Amino acid sequence: KERTYLYKIMNRASVLALDKNRVWHVRKKLSMNEMKKGAKLLTGTHDFSAYRSSSCTAKSPIRTIKKISIKKNRNGKIIIRFVSKSFLQKQVRSMVGCLKFLGEGKWDISTFKKTLNSKKRSLCAPPAPACGLYLEKVKY
């Protein structure tokens, strides 16, 4: 069993008409290298308490992220894929928000790591908007 979510960020000055309200528009150039370093830290089994919604009713905040891939096309669209057996409420959007902070230089990798290990929602970046989130695949 596994689910694949993808999140779309348009990383350029303007959004293409077809992508309006279907991507998160981020004008500031994001560092793909920094975001990939963060994705590597999120991969594996962790306590994702810092990344869950305050209204999340899951019994355990421990989840295993099997894979995170980040790709950017020529038009500036960044696609981030997350693969796991299950996710917490708002977990993917919260992880994307933190990866964005890392990519734009608001956080360094040690701050990113501290947030993951803190288990405190208050230290997490704001969750990314829902408009860029897609459930791509479910395997039974």
Task: Enumerate the predicted regions with their spans.
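Structured-RNA-binding interfaces characteristic of tRNA pseudouridine synthases
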Residues: 1-140
